Amino acid sequence: MAQRVQLTATVSENQLGQRLDQALAEMFPDYSRSRIKEWILDQRVLVNGKLCDKPKEKVLGGEQVAINAEIEEEARFEPQDIPLDIVYEDEDIIVINKPRDLVVHPGAGNPDGTVLNALLHYYPPIADVPRAGIVHRLDKDTTGLMVVAKTVPAQTRLVESLQRREITREYEAVAIGHMTAGGTVDEPISRHPTKRTHMAVHPMGKPAVTHYRIMEHFRVHTRLRLRLETGRTHQIRVHMAHITHPLVGDPVYGGRPRPPKGASEAFISTLRKFDRQALHATMLRLYHPISGIEMEWHAPIPQDMVELIEVMRADFEEHKDEVDWL
């Protein structure tokens, strides 16, 4: 059942020059800026008694604003007692270190058992925030840092920061192949034309930019540090596969085991058992959505990646004399 929303207020003189959607988001902090933008586009907003359907229209201050809208009841998700590794928390945000095998948001094939269900149990008031405060995601088997908003104002500002590319996200990964230098992949990404659960580089896709640098060389693998400018689904995995260096263990984009010649049984066994993409969100830096203070968190790589890197490093040391690129 839809919930009726009727709001009235006067634009402050201090908001002179702001976009209408920005001004309304400040005036009505219980509603996200994206929701307010939808109401404007749907002609649910009156400014001085006249319909306004332009979110970018500038306000002068002193306007009388009335909103007459409806909110469709969102799907109700169950709180579930799923452990969360909380790296940081205050009144406005939570930063978690997500493990593997944990989906962020319920969807087809994963109706529950997600980060969202865990958040609803850990902090019940987050149910009043759209998507339980989730503003960005990690793939099911990608580990590492995520920030979650505990309030609507915090969520609105975090989303805006993401859109302005003010949030820095860095990852560690292990890629297949010997890479000679770091670089940037600037290639648009969209849904795969035939495999609907896959993504692909496509000229008609959304802009996507990934920067990478080399941390360590192994015989036929490379340890990387990567930084996202954009946050497309599967972005790092798609971009690395596109440049013919898919991530180790990636079941979707070509990361099948490729042990080097003469590898030890320990190396081969570890590589074959590594059944997820070797990708970890290791650093998150942002400006706090309410205080504006710059904050930064780090999460060390998980044990499965530690073991993978150790056997690759041992193999490299054992066969260093056979490597032709040193």
Swiss-Prot record:
Function of the protein: Responsible for synthesis of pseudouridine from uracil at positions 1911, 1915 and 1917 in 23S ribosomal RNA.
Catalytic activity line of the entry: uridine(1911/1915/1917) in 23S rRNA = pseudouridine(1911/1915/1917) in 23S rRNA
Alphabetized SMART domains for the sequence: S4
Species annotation: Escherichia coli O157:H7
Sample GO molecular function, one term: 23S rRNA pseudouridine(1911/1915/1917) synthase activity
Annotated protein name in UniProt: Ribosomal large subunit pseudouridine synthase D
Compartments, as annotated in UniProt: Cytoplasm
Residue numbers annotated as active site: 139
Enzyme Commission designation: 5.4.99.23
Cited NCBIfam families: PRK11180.1, rluA_subfam
Gene Ontology CC annotation, any one: cytoplasm
Domain S4 RNA-binding residue range list: 18-91
UniProt entry keywords in alphabetical sequence: Cytoplasm, Isomerase, RNA-binding, rRNA processing
PANTHER family in alphabetical order: MITOCHONDRIAL RNA PSEUDOURIDINE SYNTHASE, RIBOSOMAL LARGE SUBUNIT PSEUDOURIDINE SYNTHASE D
Enzyme class of the recorded protein, top EC level: isomerase
Family to which this protein belongs: Belongs to the pseudouridine synthase RluA family.
GO biological process terms held by the UniProt record: enzyme-directed rRNA pseudouridine synthesis
